[in-house]
Amino acid sequence: MAKKGKKYQDAVKLVDKNKVYEVVEGVELVKKAATAKFDETVEVAFRLGVDPKRADQQIRGAVVLPHGTGKVQRVLVFAKGEKAKDAEAAGADFVGDADMIAKIQGGWFDFDVVVATPDMMGEVGKLGRVLGPKGLMPNPKTGTVTFDVTKAVNEIKAGKIEYRVDKAGNIHAPIGKASFDADKLVENLAALTEALNRAKPAAAKGVYMRNVTLSSTMGPGVRVAVK
C-alpha cells in the first residue's frame, strides 16, 4: 500500500490544485499521472449550477462519444419476434423476454446496458427494484426504450454513454482510457460538454458549468476550463 501511496503523492505533485488548466494540458496531466499497472479509466466530473430537487432542472440523457470509452459494453435487449432478430443482427449480447426477466430475478447481472422495446416495458417494469438502483433500467430519455433496437445497439457498441445529474448537482462520466491519445480524450470531452450545454434547463440561473475536473481511476483531480 505504501508503494501505491507514494505513486499517488508523486502524481499529486504534478498538479497545481489552485490552477484551472486548458483542456489539452489537463488531459496530458491526467495521462501522465495515471501510473497504475492497469489501463486506468479517464473520468470527468461536472459541477453544474442546477437545483436537482426541482423537476424543471433535472438533467438526463445520452451521447455517443466519437472514440468510445475503451470498454466493451455487454448489451441486453428485451424484445420479441422481428425486433428480437433485429437486436441479434445488430450485435446485442443477450436477447430475450420472459426468459431473461426470470434470469435477472434469479440474480443474473452479466450485462452493462439494457434496451427494451416499448411493448416489453410492462414486463420489464417488474425489474425496477433490481435494475433501478444499478442504473440499468431502460429509459426513453437515454434512447434505451425504443422500437429501433438496431440503432440503439449500434450506438451503445459505438461508445454511447448515459449521464444523469445527482442530488448534489454533479454529473460523472467516463471519457476513455489513459492509453487513449490525448486528442481522442479531448474530442470525447468536447462531445459530452456539448451535449450537457444542449441539455441546460431553461430554469437554471447563473453560471451553468461551475467546475469541471478530470481524473484517472487512481490519479488526482485536474480542474479544466471548458466552453
Curated annotation (Swiss-Prot):
Pfam families: Ribosomal_L1. Keywords: Repressor, Ribonucleoprotein, Ribosomal protein, RNA-binding, rRNA-binding, Translation regulation, tRNA-binding. The keyword Ribosomal protein applies. One of its GO terms (biological process) is regulation of translation. One of its GO terms (cellular component) is large ribosomal subunit. One of its GO terms (molecular function) is structural constituent of ribosome. The keyword RNA-binding applies. It comes from the Bacteria. Belongs to the universal ribosomal protein uL1 family. HAMAP family: Ribosomal_uL1_B. Binds directly to 23S rRNA. The L1 stalk is quite mobile in the ribosome, and is involved in E site tRNA release. Protein L1 is also a translational repressor protein, it controls the translation of the L11 operon by binding to its mRNA. Part of the 50S ribosomal subunit. This is Large ribosomal subunit protein uL1. It comes from Brevibacillus brevis (strain 47 / JCM 6285 / NBRC 100599).
